[in-house]
């Protein structure tokens, strides 16, 4: 359900020798890539000379601190744009298009971003991402100053979409940085500590989400979009300046002589995924879940804004996002255990039950409590998926695999977001206000302003619950569990 609120991805070693081979349990060299029976997924081999230790962990913590500033900035402006767009246009369709467009661009750019990450130093990729985001936000500021308010808020005109579009692009480029950060966890953190490192990243993202949820709503309600843009530009510049002072111990990725790497290396990503039995099925399962998750993405804010003022809704999101911090702290403290795939499935069961019950009646504390629980379990799911990929996929191909997985999984959300917006706006919401709608479904969803949206949430939760039950009894689930255990590095590493 990572795509549900675009809670962007959590961040996910064995010691590599000069020949890029690890030692076995008895100190003997492991089979090389060309040896019979060799399987690339038996360890996420690092480049020669890179050994996780105190220095690399310090670099990881510095990157993590910078991620906090960057995530605060991007989330702050993106949340503010969503609130501003709905309040000014009063259109569920407009907010659905914005959310769907964001996820669509993330999906289209995933493979390209992943290829860039694998073929360049991770620090350089992060710097480029932050710089592009800064330029986009500055362009949005220029548009805000150039055009009058009545043209900016007319969602039927080009100015509104140009203004929202450049902010959207600035947020999309952040996913390039997130893919790079996922691979730096593999690079900088020893294998046995990666699940806890992913929990730390979840904690940081939860803190960022909590801060921005509160201040985005307050900023739009009290300061307006102009000051909000100015603050976002300043924070982005601050994050970029800090990032330039960080050093990541890494080497330039090797390149084939005379060969130009493809911009979209789909073949390399698919090859790495096929090398791990069951991994493709996990990605397809996440894709289906995100198809259902697009409903949450499209309708969670409109439903919340029917129960709360924009200022109150921002505070509710800020308070409930503390659950995201708690979930990340739990993983950082206790890890995921020996079977992260099982943890991932159980979390999806909880998410499905939340979708069924948290809008069953139009009661603010039920909705807020459901969001709080949702925030608690999402970091566990994110950390589980990241930890699995970081162990079973070779480091040299992780960027492409993360990017490909992002593209495939996230591509489902815009489909449902684009579909459910018009269906809710012009179909279910008006229908549930009629006597016929109340007579047919009133026993289930009760009475209120947004019973049509509640009906969509309930149906989506039931669909997800069935999908998880089927997945947990399927052969690919058992195969991938074995693949993860077989990929465990020997104790000597």
Regions found by a protein language model. Name each.
Residues 2-55, 473-493:
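Intrinsic disorder in cytosolic terminal tails and internal cytosolic loops
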Residues 3, 38, 96, 108-112, ...:
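C-terminal transmembrane bundle of multi-pass solute transporters/carriers
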Residues 41-44, 244-268, 480-490:
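Flexible cytoplasmic inter-helical loops of multi-pass small-molecule transporters
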Residues 44-107, 271, 275-320, 421:
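Helix-loop boundary and gating motifs at the non-cytosolic
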Residues 140-141, 173, 177, 234-253, ...:
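C-terminal membrane-cytosol helix-exit motif in multi-pass small-molecule transporters
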Residues 142-166, 358-371:
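Helix-loop junctions at membrane interfaces in 12-TM secondary transporters
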Residues 153-159, 205-243:
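Helix-loop-helix hairpin linking two adjacent transmembrane segments in secondary transporters
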Residues 166-207:
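Cytoplasmic helix-loop-helix junction between adjacent transmembrane helices
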């Amino acid at each position: 359900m990572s795509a549900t609120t675009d809670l962007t991805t959590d961040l996910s070693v064995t010691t590599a020798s000069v020949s890029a081979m690890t030692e076995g349990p008895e100190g003997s060299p492991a089979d090389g890539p060309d040896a019979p029976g060799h399987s690339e997924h038996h360890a996420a081999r690092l480049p020669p000379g890179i050994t996780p230790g105190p220095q690399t962990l310090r670099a990881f913590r510095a990157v993590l601190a910078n991620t906090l500033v960057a995530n605060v900035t991007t989330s702050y402006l993106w949340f503010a744009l969503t609130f501003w767009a709905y309040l000014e246009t009063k259109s569920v369709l407009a907010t659905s298009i914005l959310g769907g467009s964001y996820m669509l661009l993330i999906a289209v750019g995933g493979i390209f971003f992943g290829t860039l990450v694998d073929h360049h130093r991770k620090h350089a990729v992060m710097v480029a991402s932050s710089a592009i985001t800064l330029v986009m936000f500055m362009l949005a500021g220029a548009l805000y100053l150039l055009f009058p308010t009545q043209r900016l808020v007319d969602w039927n005109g080009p100015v509104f979409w140009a203004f929202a579009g450049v902010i959207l692009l600035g947020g999309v480029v952040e996913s390039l940085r997130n893919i790079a950060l996922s691979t730096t966890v593999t690079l900088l953190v020893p294998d046995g500590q990666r699940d806890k490192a992913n929990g730390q990243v979840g904690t940081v993202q939860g803190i960022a989400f909590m801060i921005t949820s509160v201040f985005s709503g307050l900023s739009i309600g009290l300061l307006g979009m102009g000051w909000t843009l100015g603050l976002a530009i300043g924070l982005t510049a601050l994050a970029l300046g800090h990032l330039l002072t960080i050093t990541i111990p890494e080497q330039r990725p090797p390149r084939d002589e005379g060969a130009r790497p493809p911009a979209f290396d789909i073949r390399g990503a698919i090859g790495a995924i096929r090398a791990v039995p069951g991994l493709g099925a996990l990605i397809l399962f996440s894709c289906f879940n995100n198809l259902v998750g697009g409903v949450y993405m499209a309708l969670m804010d409109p439903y919340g804004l029917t129960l709360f003022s924009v200022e109150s809704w921002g505070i509710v999101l800020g308070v409930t996002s503390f659950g995201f911090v708690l979930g990340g702290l739990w993983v950082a403290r206790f890890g995921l255990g020996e079977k992260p795939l099982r943890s991932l499935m159980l979390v999806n069961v909880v998410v499905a039950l939340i979708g069924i019950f948290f809008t069953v009646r139009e009661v603010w504390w039920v909705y807020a409590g459901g969001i709080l629980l949702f925030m608690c379990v999402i970091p566990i799911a994110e950390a589980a998926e990241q930890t699995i990929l970081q162990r079973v996929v070779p480091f040299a191909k992780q960027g492409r695999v993360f990017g490909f997985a992002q593209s495939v999984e996230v591509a489902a959300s815009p489909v449902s977001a684009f579909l459910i917006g018009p269906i809710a706006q012009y179909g279910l919401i008006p229908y549930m206000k009629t006597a016929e709608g109340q007579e047919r479904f009133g026993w289930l969803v009760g009475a209120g302003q947004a019973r049509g949206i509640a009906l969509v949430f309930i149906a989506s939760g039931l669909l997800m619950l069935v999908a998880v039950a089927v997945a947990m009894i399927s052969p690919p689930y058992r195969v991938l569990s074995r693949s993860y255990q077989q990929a465990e590095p020997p104790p000597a590493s």
